[in-house]
């Protein structure tokens, strides 16, 4: 994924994961 979801995932998972975002390099990205 290359589109940032405006969310970090250093301490907690991506809340935006419900819309398809995933953690990459401590930042949530949409595939």
Swiss-Prot record:
Pfam families in UniProt: Cyclotide
Domain of life (superkingdom): Eukaryota
Disulfide-bonded cysteines: 5-21, 9-23, 14-28
Tissue: Detected in seeds (at protein level).
Cross-link Cyclopeptide (Gly-Asp) placement: 1-31
PROSITE patterns: CYCLOTIDE, CYCLOTIDE_BRACELET
Mod. after translation: This is a cyclic peptide.
Keywords, in A-Z order: Disulfide bond, Knottin, Plant defense
GO biological process: cytolysis in another organism; defense response
Tagged with keyword Signal: no
Record note on domains: The presence of a 'disulfide through disulfide knot' structurally defines this protein as a knottin.
Record's function text: Probably participates in a plant defense mechanism.
UniProt family annotation: Belongs to the cyclotide family. Bracelet subfamily.
Name assigned to this protein: Cyclotide hyen-I
Organism ancestry: Eukaryota, Viridiplantae, Streptophyta, Embryophyta, Tracheophyta
